[in-house]
Amino acid sequence: MAIATIDPTTGITLKTFDAHTPEEVENRIARAEAAFRSLQNTSFEERARWMHKAADILESEADEVARLIATEMGKTLTTAKYEALKSATGMRHFADHAQRYLSPETPVPASEVNASNLHVQFDPLGVVLAVMPWNYPLWQAVRFAAPALMAGNTGLLKHASNVPQCALYLGDLFARGGFPEGAFQTLLVEGKDVIPLVDDARIRAVTLTGSVAAGSAIAEAAGRNIKRSVLELGGMDVFIVMPSADIEKAAAQAVIARLQNSGQSCIAAKRFYVHEDVYDRFEHLFVTGMAEAVAGDPLDESTSFGPLATERGRQDVHELVRDAREKGAAVQCGGEIPEGEGWYYPATVLTGVTEDMRIYREECFGPVACLYKVSSLQEAIALSNDSDFGLSSSVWTNDETEATEAARSIEAGGVFINGLTASFPAVPFGGLKDSGYGRELSAYGIREFVNIKTVWTS
């Protein structure tokens, strides 16, 4: 089977790669296992030196890498370069802080547990498999790779099949930085080949960012093998606007929140709950901003957002919009597939969305916003929590009591007050319910793939 780069602006295949044979996959697993025996005995200082060098290389090649990302999956050149530089920043963060995150700890004085010496240490697990998506082809993989490698693990990356060049670039990047041969490798395989990898005893843990269906399959396989796993799945993130908020700022940020990455982000806001006292004003500003956003060539600096990454993805988005329209939702802007080549979809705002519509509960991975009127913060929170997902949320209020209540009551992995949901290297990222389990980034993320070992001395 060939794995291809297809230009989402034209649908034309740009480059193809042969999928790895079973023998090639076996060789890569064996190399990863052999590399672990070496890497686990290196010092934090050595690994940090290699990681910083890899970050140096990435920064020096940021323009080239941005063009690669934009060409493979369609995000604008500006956001692609930002992703490349953010990835380098994440690499430097773990190079600088991994030793602190994983330094031995003494939970209580040794005498309290009848010991002369007591400490807890954090040992690497071994080979870790990462199954990563196409929407942030560099950042998603780096936020796994950087902490895993700095902890002393080795990594195998099974990337999405439509971003093979990004995957291969990452496979080379860490080797160019100085990490031992086999420490981080890319597997060009199909999705059906993932479960046998999870079943392989040499792979000690697995992390996946992707759909609920894919996460469920990984969780089942990992559970069957009593194997560590971390899942970052879908999101139905909310954007709540209360009367005390700066409405002009909130509306402008709401456009960004929905259109980031052409709406193809788990943490892109999808449900907008606006208090009735400011609803009309917000709706006018928001719909105007969405309607003015330009979908176009990601390499053109005037473009607001690019095409969707796949033809199937665009069709899925349009089917959700069509279902809502047929059941009575009003389309305030957008809502139609444009003529011409490329997998473009316009910025779309729906009102009058009801529970019988698929988009009410299903994640829409594209530039479509559902706008709702609420009478109180409590109603907004109740609606927010009435979802199978719980990844993150954004709440706009200048009332401290409201902010505190939202932070306490919203069922999500994150609550952002007067700001957009984002991921930062130093801050844990993840969700609950169907949005997954475990955490990425920060001290919490790096500790997902270590053995927490108690050392007690009589």
From Swiss-Prot:
One of its GO terms (molecular function) is NAD binding. The keyword Lipid biosynthesis does not apply. Pathway: Carbohydrate metabolism; D-xylose degradation. Coiled coil: none annotated. It catalyses: an aldehyde + NAD(+) + H2O = a carboxylate + NADH + 2 H(+); an aldehyde + NADP(+) + H2O = a carboxylate + NADPH + 2 H(+). CDD domains: ALDH_SSADH1_GabD1 (cd07100). Its EC number is 1.2.1.3, 1.2.1.4. Signal peptide: none annotated. The active site is at 232 (proton acceptor), 266 (nucleophile). Induction: Is induced by D-xylose. No significant levels of expression can detected when the cells are grown on various other sugars such as L-xylose, L-arabinose, D-galactose, D-tagatose and D-glucose. Gene3D superfamilies: Aldehyde Dehydrogenase, Chain A, domain 1, Aldehyde Dehydrogenase, Chain A, domain 2. Keywords: Carbohydrate metabolism, NAD, NADP, Oxidoreductase, Plasmid. It is an enzyme of class 1 (oxidoreductase). InterPro entries: Ald_DH/histidinol_DH, Ald_DH_C, Ald_DH_CS_CYS, Ald_DH_CS_GLU, Ald_DH_N, AldDh_AldH, Aldehyde_DH_dom, ALDH_GabD1-like. NADP(+) binds at residues 134-135, 158-161, 210-211, 233, 363. Monomer. Aldehyde dehydrogenase able to oxidize various aldehydes such as formaldehyde, glyceraldehyde, butyraldehyde, glutaraldehyde and benzaldehyde (in vitro). Is likely involved in the oxidative D-xylose degradation pathway, catalyzing the oxidation step of 2-oxoglutarate semialdehyde to 2-oxoglutarate. Is able to use both NAD(+) and NADP(+); however, shows a preference for NADP(+). Does not display succinate semialdehyde dehydrogenase activity. This is Aldehyde dehydrogenase. The lineage of its organism: Bacteria, Bacillati, Actinomycetota, Actinomycetes, Micrococcales. The gene is aldh.
